[in-house]
Structures are given as structure tokens and as C-alpha cells.
Amino acid sequence: MRKTVIAGNWKMNLSEKEALSLAHSIKEKIPAISKGRISMIFPSTLHLAGVAKILQGTEILVGAQNVYPSGLAAFTGETSPEQLKELGVKVVMIGHSERRQFLGETNSFCNEKIHFLLKNDFIVLYCVGETLMERESGKTFEVISSQIREGLKGIHSHSFSNLILAYEPVWAIGTGKVATPAQAQEVHFFIRKEIAGLFLGAKEIAESISILYGGSVKPDNIQTLLKEKDLDGGLVGGASQKIDTYAGLF
């Protein structure tokens, strides 16, 4: 059975005081209402240490929004997986649309990061999705196929147990627009099909991997989305940054 995951992406939001206060509230409320769903939190890098310390010893996973695929080295402004491990970080998000769109992150660089992280026993949340222009020009499946085939190139079958995917239609992020359940299901089904075709024997992996939906997910639409066969949770932005709306996702 696939795991249901609710992943909160705080992006470059919240002051330190707000982040730590929210972490305390999450620690108090979420374990009691999680109902078997896995909770992940992705604070900004500056707040990782404080949030991880608060949530230490709970089942809530603290993740990083980005990483550089290297050990300790001279890469100014970057963060090494080795440093993240010291903080108790177990999950790293790779390929978020904002990093692709604004920071030029490519499928091949995502692939390099994913290989490095899996080799070092991290869980990877890999994001894929199309822009509004790509959807309107009929390129949704072409774009996502490239992101999957190039981003997951060379990943060994045994490593997929530490891999989660998220479909985030860029046109539905922070816009208030949400893909209809049918639209989301269509793409999630396609993602499973693409994973099944990566290598011989990948069909079973495709059926077992969790695929989250990200795009203006809120308490009032998540249950409808999760009724779809191939949707296994949410990658949530704004609604994860307040305790009432985050708790409402469970």
C-alpha cells in the first residue's frame, strides 16, 4: 500500500520566531490527528536547525528545500548533505518549479543531486510539472516525460524506496487555481506509466511509489483530490504555513 504524505513547503517565508512557533504547534497537534499520514516540513535553510531540534523524536520529518551534491567543499552559498545530516534532516526536495523557473535548475542537475542524495541515504522528494504555456500548447506530457526520464536517469531499482514524486502544475502554484481532480489524476497516471517504462521490472515500483499533488492545496480541496486513484498526498505551500490550515489537511 502506498504511503499518504502531507508535505509542507514554507519556501522563503516566516521569521525565525514564526517558524519555531509553528514547529511547536505542529509538534503538539499533528501527531494526534495524522491518521497514519506522513507529515513532512520543509523550512527555509536558516530555520532548519531550530525546527529540526523542536521536532526531534517525533514522526514528523524535517526536510531541506535544496542542497548541493557534494561533501564539504568550496561552494560559496551552498549547503552540503553532510551538513544537513548533522541537523537531523532526512528529506530533500529537488526540482521545485521555482528553482527550475527562476534559478535555471535543469533535469540533469536534478539527476546529479538525486543520485548523490540517494547514495547518502536521504529521502528525495522530486518535483515535476508544466507551465501554463506548456499546457496550453499541448506539451504537458512531453515536458513531464523529459523531467522523469532525465531526472531519474540511472537510478537503481533498490533506491526507489527512498523516492517520492510530486506533480506541481506551475500554473496552479500560488494562483488560487487548482487542477481539477480529473486533470490531476490524468497526469499522475501518466507519471506512473513513465516510471514503469524506465527499466525492466519498474512496473511494480511505479505502482508502489507515492506521487503527491502540489498546486494551491487547501483543507477544502484535499479530500476530493485524494479520492483519485493515483494521488497519494499533497505538496502544500501557503496552507502549510499556519497551524489551523496545516492541521486541516489531515
Swiss-Prot record:
Protein keywords: Cytoplasm, Gluconeogenesis, Glycolysis, Isomerase
PROSITE patterns: TIM_1, TIM_2
InterPro entries documented for this protein: Aldolase_TIM, TIM_sf, TrioseP_Isoase_bac/euk, Triosephosphate_isomerase, Triosephosphate_isomerase_AS
UniProt: substrate binding residues: N9, W10, K11, G174, S216, G237, G238
Pathway(s) the chain acts in: Carbohydrate biosynthesis; gluconeogenesis; Carbohydrate degradation; glycolysis; D-glyceraldehyde 3-phosphate from glycerone phosphate: step 1/1
Catalyzed reactions: D-glyceraldehyde 3-phosphate = dihydroxyacetone phosphate
Cell location: Cytoplasm
Superkingdom to which the source organism belongs: Bacteria
A GO MF label: triose-phosphate isomerase activity
Annotated catalytic residues: H96, E168
Gene Ontology cellular component annotations, sorted alphabetically: cytosol
GO biological process: gluconeogenesis; glyceraldehyde-3-phosphate biosynthetic process; glycerol catabolic process; glycolytic process
Enzyme Commission number, as recorded: 5.3.1.1
Subunit structure: Homodimer.
Role summary: Involved in the gluconeogenesis. Catalyzes stereospecifically the conversion of dihydroxyacetone phosphate (DHAP) to D-glyceraldehyde-3-phosphate (G3P).
Family of the protein in this entry: Belongs to the triosephosphate isomerase family.
Protein name, as recorded: Triosephosphate isomerase
